[in-house]
Amino acid sequence: MSTNNEAIFNPGKGAGESVGVAILGLGTVGTEVLRLLGEKAEDFERRIGGPIEVKGVAVRDKSKPRPGIDPELITDDAFSLVERDDVDLVVEVIGGIDYPRRVVLAALRAGKSVVTANKALVAAHGAELSEAADSSGADLFFEAAVAAAIPIVGPLRRSLAGDTVNKVVGIVNGTTNFILDAMDSTGADYDEMLAEATRLGYAEADPTADVEGHDAA
């Protein structure tokens, strides 16, 4: 089943069996995902019926210092990681389009369910990814890629199933929302708040997709 953004991930395992997770990308988002998987381990186990075990983290540069992270988990071979037998769920937070597309397709075709926060990837290749998920029986979760990860896709599908939505109005990019709100409330200028958004990790090192509207589109 693909594009499943309404149900909790079901790994299809018996009660108490562990769920193997692979994380692709260890920037601001990936690092936070890894932290939360450890900090909220008991909550996740209670929700899915078994413990979560991080099996590996794929990065572009293995030589970069990563304090507090087991070096045995780090790999620069994302393709081998997502195809491992002990990996059930892949979390993609790499960014970009072409490379993550190839890795996510490899994961889905190997029967691994995927969670992605990559809105550019979903916008450009969502249909292809959904087809791959359908073919293998894997799940593709993309709620994290929509409207700054607020839970909106599931409610729109369920609660408004009988309605016709003519348009949606709002500032749907989190970085832009932060910048505009701060400019309005503090009187700071745009460049100052863009720099602050980057420092806080809200904006990427290259914020073009955020501030020029590509992510929102």
Positions of the model-derived regions?
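N-terminal glycine-/serine-/threonine-rich beta1-alpha1-beta2 phosphate-ribose binding loop
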Residues: 2-110
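Active-site catalytic pocket residues across diverse enzymes, especially alpha/beta-hydrolases
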Residues: 37, 41, 125, 133, ...
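Short, active-site-adjacent cap segments at secondary-structure transitions
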Residues: 64-65, 122, 178
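General beta-strand structural signal in soluble alpha/beta enzymes
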Residues: 74-76, 83, 91-92, 115-117, ...
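Rossmann-fold NAD(P)-binding glycine/threonine-rich loop
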Residues: 94-110, 117-158
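Glycine-enriched alpha-helix->loop->beta-strand junction motifs that scaffold or abut catalytic
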Residues: 111-113, 174
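Core active-site phosphate/anionic-ligand binding loop and the adjoining beta-turn-alpha structural block
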Residues: 134, 139-217
